[in-house]
C-alpha cells in the first residue's frame, strides 16, 4: 500500500508540491490572523514563525531562497529587537531540526538576530504606509542577505581557519546574490500584507507607535 503512493515526481514536481503547500499554509495563516483581535502581537509573531519555518523547509531545494530574512527584518521594524531575536533564534533552530542542525545553527541565529536589530534601528525609515514605497525596505533586504550569509560564513573558522575565510566568502558570492534576489521577491510579495498585519497588532496605537515600541523593547 505504501509503494502505491511512492510516485517519482522529479525535482520540479517536488518543488511544485512544496510551493503549493507553502501557499496553502500562508493562506490558512492569513485567514487565522483575520479572526484575531487587535494588539495580538504575540500570536502574530507565532504565526509568522510558522510561515518562516515552513517557507525555509519547503523552499530548501532552491539554493539560498527563503522568506525568513524578510520576515525577521519586518518583525524588527514593527515589533522591536527582543521579539525579532526570539523569532530569529526559534526559526533557525526549528527549521534546522528538519534540514540539518549543527554549530552553524548558532551562527544563523546570530545572523538573523542582526537582521532584526537592523530593522529595529531603521524602523522609522522602513515603516510602510499607504503612500510609501517599499524601495528602501528592498535595498535594506538586499544588504541583509549579504550580512546574514557572511555572519554564517564565520562558522567555517572552526574548521578551515582564518586564512581561508576570505576565499570561502568569495566562493559563496553567487549564493549571496541568490539570497538577495530572493529577498527582492519576498519584499515585493510580503511587504504590504505583513505591514498591514503588523500595524494592526501593534500594542501602541498612534503615529509614532513603531518607534516607541522599538525603543521600549531594545
Model-derived regions, located:
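Membrane-interfacial loop-to-transmembrane alpha-helix junctions, especially the N-terminal start
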Residues: 37-45, 80-84, 137, 194
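Alpha-helical transmembrane segments of multi-pass membrane proteins, especially transporters
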Residues: 44, 73, 87-88, 92, ...
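Generic transmembrane alpha-helix motif of multi-pass integral membrane proteins
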Residues: 68-84, 118
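Membrane-embedded alpha-helical hairpins and interfacial helices in multi-pass inner-membrane proteins
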Residues: 1-18, 105-107, 125-214, 218
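Aromatic-anchored segments of alpha-helical transmembrane domains
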Residues: 2-4, 49-57, 90-101, 141-151
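Hydrophobic transmembrane alpha-helices
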Residues: 1-74
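Structural signal for the C-terminal ends of transmembrane alpha-helices
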Residues: 23-35, 78-79, 118-127, 192-199
